[in-house]
């Protein structure tokens, strides 16, 4: 009886932590609001609006020209797992969706921001084809602002923003042009691969 009572007391004293979402399915997605009517999709291991004392680092992975954020999310999950860092790392892969008819035929949800695949596209901070007030950099700015909230992620020590191929082009340009780097209060590291 004493052992079960002691065990019950210990269970009450142990904080409950969120479990990372580890599937590249809708259960691991979240909509990021961009203005009043616009939204953009991310894959993520933890919700951006629920307090999480456990998260110490963030890894934001930008997909390539194929706009396959789900595959990049899977790869980043595997890397975090192999590094033994899955539980205290929030992994995010934003989706720059497009269905502008030039080889890009993503299915968009209601109010989902549509980015161009050609010309002044999402990889260069281009203006959305569905909302002329938004650029692809606005989307990343909002993700980073949410990560830097101390009331949600009080123990976040650093953010890594990385991209491969067209995602690498995006990260290179974003590093030079973003408006939030010096305002976040969290160190931000940029890693570019095969731009």
Where are the model-predicted features located?
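Glycine-rich "HGGG/HGxG" loop immediately N-terminal to the catalytic nucleophile
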Residues: 98-110
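A domain-start/cap signature at the N-terminus of enzymes
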Residues: 16-58, 66-90, 115-132, 138-139, ...
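Conserved alpha/beta-hydrolase
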Residues: 86-101
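Bacterial N-terminal signal peptides
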Residues: 4-13
């Amino acid at each position: 009886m004493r052992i079960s009572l002691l065990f019950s007391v210990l269970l009450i004293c142990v904080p409950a932590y969120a479990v990372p979402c580890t599937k590249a399915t809708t259960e691991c997605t979240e909509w990021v609001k961009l203005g009043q009517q616009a939204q953009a999709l991310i894959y993520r291991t933890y919700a951006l609006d629920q307090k999480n004392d456990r998260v110490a680092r963030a890894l934001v992975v930008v997909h390539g020209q194929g706009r396959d954020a789900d595959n990049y999310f899977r790869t980043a999950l595997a890397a975090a797992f192999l590094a033994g860092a899955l539980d205290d790392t929030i992994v995010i892969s934003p989706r720059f969706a497009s269905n502008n008819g030039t080889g890009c035929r993503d299915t968009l949800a209601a109010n989902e921001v549509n980015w161009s695949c050609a010309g002044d596209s999402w990889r260069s901070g281009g203006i959305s084809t569905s909302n002329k007030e938004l650029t692809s950099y606005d989307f990343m700015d909002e993700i980073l602002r949410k990560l830097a909230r101390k009331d949600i992620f009080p123990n976040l020590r650093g953010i890594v923003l990385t991209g491969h191929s067209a995602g690498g082009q995006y990260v290179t340009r974003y590093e030079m042009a973003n408006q939030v780097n010096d305002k976040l209060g969290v160190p931000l590291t940029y890693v570019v691969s095969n731009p």
